[in-house]
Amino acid sequence: MSGEDEQQEQTIAEDLVVTKYKMGGDIANRVLRSLVEASSSGVSVLSLCEKGDAMIMEETGKIFKKEKEMKKGIAFPTSISVNNCVCHFSPLKSDQDYILKEGDLVKIDLGVHVDGFIANVAHTFVVDVAQGTQVTGRKADVIKAAHLCAEAALRLVKPGNQNTQVTEAWNKVAHSFNCTPIEGMLSHQLKQHVIDGEKTIIQNPTDQQKKDHEKAEFEVHEVYAVDVLVSSGEGKAKDAGQRTTIYKRDPSKQYGLKMKTSRAFFSEVERRFDAMPFTLRAFEDEKKARMGVVECAKHELLQPFNVLYEKEGEFVAQFKFTVLLMPNGPMRITSGPFEPDLYKSEMEVQDAELKALLQSSASRKTQKKKKKKASKTAENATSGETLEENEAGD
């Protein structure tokens, strides 16, 4: 294989790439479900984060075993953010842990990659809801709002549509539940080994962000991690001084590190994680990792994923799914075990256009018989997907 061929970007136009995405998605969904089941009152968040990451490594270790050079594993470390914590809470052993309690609103966020093809997922639920009862009040409002935002996006992120259409729909859905999307949060296009591709969808932009944010059109064979974060409050996420534990390398930055600890740490980051987000928990010597990261972050070799908070007493819900824009419609490869009947809100979407959108089918068109004959490869690439779509859309 010549160097030129290697440089050529692989997309979901190739069957094998679709397969890798689906395998990663399948693992992400299984790990997520297992963590949701393990989340009950008295369980430590640290233990769940460790369990999630260990499961991802174990499951990705079972596939493509013959491909010794293939990188696979964690594309986003397991983060469990509770109540008013917005995102990226993934404590180290040396940090203060959080113990789940009944009634906590929990967001689990994680990512898996197979050969650099990324499947991200996030899901929100309430801990220990008694059988036969429903979640009501602001928790129900915010979870319903975020879930419907995700459902709207599944129907809007498709070739020919603009990113601004999604942003507008999110504002309308959230506001109908008297909630607000978290200001300035981005959903990114995904490419091989790249979790933050150039096309993005912005949530609830400020006037300045509206001016700066690039309008983009979705195109066939693109992949997106659609990330919805909705707050019962004002939607402003702030850093409250909680230690950052998740970072990723910025391949565009160069700097000659001065400290030996930093150099050793950074070379391990490059070797083990490339440009994927990672947690300092993954290092054998956590103390050295905490020291080594400082100089790397200061000179922007590493980008931090800061732990953010909404105001105390508010609730933030998150749903994230990964979608492949196939020629015959969007294919969602990740989703959580959402149970709509558990959440009872006094509010609902009023906008007629949005209502119609949410009621429209999100399953993909199955290809006509003639087409199938003409393109056996297309059939192979899309076989069995409508079933998954229906499951994901439940």
Swiss-Prot record:
Consequence the record notes for mutating residue 361 to A: Loss of phosphorylation and interaction with ERBB3 and HUWE1
Post-translational modification: Phosphorylated on serine and threonine residues. Phosphorylation is enhanced by HRG treatment. Basal phosphorylation is PKC-dependent and HRG-induced phosphorylation is predominantly PKC-independent. Phosphorylation at Ser-361 by PKC/PRKCD regulates its nucleolar localization.
Regions of compositional bias (Basic residues) in chain numbering: 365-375
Chain positions with Phosphothreonine modification: 366, 386
Cross-link Glycyl lysine isopeptide (Lys-Gly) (interchain with G-Cter in SUMO2): where in chain: 298
Region annotation (Interaction with RNA) ranges: 361-375
Gene Ontology BP terms: negative regulation of apoptotic process; negative regulation of DNA-templated transcription; positive regulation of cell differentiation; regulation of translation; rRNA processing
UniProt xrefs under CDD domains: PA2G4-like
Tissue expr: Isoform 2 is undetectable whereas isoform 1 is strongly expressed in cancer cells (at protein level). Isoform 1 and isoform 2 are widely expressed, including heart, brain, lung, pancreas, skeletal muscle, kidney, placenta and liver.
Outcome recorded upon mutating residue 363 to A: No effect on in vitro phosphorylation by PKC
Disordered: annotated segments: 358-394
Record region (RNA-binding): 46-54
Annotated GO MF terms: nucleic acid binding; RNA binding; transcription corepressor activity; ubiquitin protein ligase binding
Residues annotated with Phosphoserine modification: 2, 335, 361
PTM annotation (N-acetylserine): residues: 2
Protein name in the entry: Proliferation-associated protein 2G4
